[in-house]
Amino acid sequence: MGRQNVVVVFGLVFLAVLGLAAAASSPSPSASPSKAPSTSTPEVEAPVSEDTIGTTDDDAAASPGDDDVAVAGPLGSDSSYGSNGPSGSADSADSGAAALGVSAVVVGVTSIVGSFLFF
């Protein structure tokens, strides 16, 4: 039983040291100069156009029954999709769920191998 505790403690200490080493790594050098530029440029807002999201023809807030609303409906509703509905299963292989399945397999194999150390 004592040997198992030593292995667990050693593993936890190893992970802690590894985490501290990763957190303490120096940042990569940047190509930008360390001094501030001698001339400052004023910050300018982009001009508002009809293509900007959330703009209407007037300054008044649009009412729900108004034809001049900026958003057709709540995000994710059928009216907000229009002709651009949610994508099908064509990109399902590139989704995060596939990566989650791989990590679940790795965790399962690791737990089985780890059980041999304790039993």
Swiss-Prot record:
- Signal sequence residues: 1-23
**For bias kind Acidic residues, which ranges apply?**
56-69
Does this entry carry the keyword Transmembrane?
yes
Residue stretches spanning the membrane: 99-118
Q: In which tissues is it expressed?
A: Expressed in mature pollen grains, developing microspores and tapetal cells.
Task: Spell out the subcellular localization from the entry.
Answer: Membrane
Print the keywords alphabetically.
Developmental protein, Membrane, Signal, Transmembrane, Transmembrane helix
Q: Where is the composition biased (Low complexity)?
A: 24-42, 82-95
Give a short account of what the protein does: Required for pollen fertility and development. Active in both diploid tapetum and haploid microspores. Major pollen protein.
Query: What protein name applies here?
Result: Anther-specific protein BCP1
